[in-house]
Amino acid sequence: MKKFSILCIVLFANSYFAFAQTESMAAKVAATAMATLWKEQVGADTAKPTKWTYDQGVVLLGIERLWIQTANPVYFSYMQKSMDYFVSENGDIKFYKAQDYNIDNILCGRILLTLYNVTGQLKYYKAASLLRGQLKGQPRTKEGGFWHKKVYPYQMWLDGLYMGQPFYTAYAKQFNEPEAFDDIANQFIWMEAHARDAKTGLLYHGWDESKEQKWANPLTGCSPHFWGRAMGWYEMALVDVLENFPATHPKRADLIAILKRLVDAIKKVQDPATGLWYDILNLPNEKANYLEASASAMFVCATAKAVRLGFLPASYLAVSKKGYDGILKRFIKTDEKGYTNLEGTVSVSGLGGKPYRDGSFAYYMSEKVIVNDPKGVGAFIQAANEMEWHAAAKTGKGQLFLLDDYYNAEKKKDIKGIEYAYHYKWPEMYNNGFSFLGNVITSNGLRTGTLSEAPTANNLKNAAIYMIVDADNVADNPTPNYMNE
C-alpha cells in the first residue's frame, strides 16, 4: 500500500506540474482558434457564416485531446457549444443533408459521440446515429469502397478515409457492430491497392473506378499527383482507426503493415533541411512548389501518435520531432494581438467539380495559401498535443496498472440493450473521472489494463499496481464476488 501511495502521489504531482507550466503550444493555438473561428456558434461577436463542416471537426478533435490532457472545462464547454449550435433537442443536425451522401459530413460525429459519453444526452446519440445511417446508404464502388460524395460517383479519395472511418470505428466499437470492422479495414486495403505507386510508395490523391474523369489515368484511374494533405488525412485516419480497432481482429495486422509502408514512404520525401513536406510531395525542385503546414502537421501528429500507441517503433518518433521543429520555426507566428497563428496552409485542393479541377501540378499550385485555415490549425493542435505528450517525463514507463473488474463487476445495459462493464472503468468519461485517471497514468508512461478474474500471484506478476475500487455488495450486483483470503 505504501509503494502504491507513493507512486500515485508522484504520478499526480507530475501531471499537476505539467499542467501548471507555461502554456503549451497546443493551448496557445487552441486559444486563438476559439477566439477567432466560428464565433456565432459560441456566442462571440463578429460572427462568420458557417455550416456543418469537417473543417470544424478537425479543430474540435485537437481541442478534445487538449481537454483530455488538461481536464480544463473551458475546452469541453467550447466543444459542446460548437455542436449545440447545430444539434437540436430531438437530434436533428442543422444544415446537414444525409441524401447528399457527402462523406465529409461524417467527421463531426466523433465529437457527438464524446458529448454523448460525457453527458448522456440522447440528442447527441441520435445525431451520431443519423451519420451512422448515412454510411449504411453511402454509394460504393463495385468492391465496396465508399464513394467520396454522391456528386463524385465511383471515386475514392484519400481524404474520405479520415472523414468517415474513425467515426465508423468508434461507433461500431461502442454500439456492438462487430461486422463493421471488416468493412472498415477493407476501405484502407482497397484504397492502398488502387492508389499506391509501387516505385515511391506514395499514394495518389484520388482514384476513379470508372476511369471517366478527365483527371483519371485511363489505365489505373488514379489522379496525377501525390498531394501532401491527402496523404496526411490517410495516415491520421489509419492511426485513429487502429486506436479503436479490435486487438484480435485478423485484419488489424494488415492495417499496421499499411501504416508502416506509408510512413516509410513519407520519411523519404521529408525535406532534409527543414523537416517539413512539400505540397506535392515528390516534386521539391519544382519552382512553384512549397512547404505546406497542414500536411506537415498531419504527418507529425499521426506518426507520433502511432509511436505512442505502439503501432510503430520508437525510432519513428525522430520523423515527428524533426517535422515539429520545422513547423515551429517556419509556420508559427505571434501577432500584435497576442494570437498564435499558423501560416502556410493551402485552403483547399480537390478533383473535378465546378469549376473543374484537373489534378495537374498547375492546378494544385493555383490554390490559395492562407493563415489559420482550420484544417491546418486543427492538425497542428493535434500534433502539438502528441509532441507535448512525448516530451513529458515518463515516471512509470513500461509498468502495468491493473484495475479490478472482479470484485467490482457491475453491469449495465446501453441504449441498444447491450450489457457492458460499468462503474469505475477506464473508458468512462462522465463525472467519476476514470478516463482522466487513465490518461494521467498513461501520460506517465504506464499501461492500463483490467483484470476480470480473481487476483492470483500468477495474474498479478506483471503488474506494478492492482487497484480495487468500490467492491460490490448485493445492492450493486446480485452475485457479488467476495474476498476469501
Where do the PLM segments sit?
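Bacterial Sec-dependent N-terminal signal peptides
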Residues: 1-22
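Long, well-ordered core segments of solenoidal/helical folds
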Residues: 22-43, 77-95, 126-145, 178-207, ...
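CBM-like carbohydrate-recognition segments
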Residues: 22-57, 66-79, 85-105, 109, ...
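N-terminal, post-signal-peptide region of Sec/Tat-exported proteins
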Residues: 49-86, 422, 428-435, 439-451
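Solvent-exposed loop/turn segments at secondary-structure junctions
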Residues: 66, 85-86, 241, 284, ...
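Inter-helical turn/loop segments and adjacent helix faces that build the functional surface
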Residues: 171-182, 241-253, 306-314
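Oxyanion-binding "anion nests"
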Residues: 235-284, 288
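Short, surface-exposed patches at the edges or C-terminal ends of soluble domains, predominantly
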Residues: 393-485
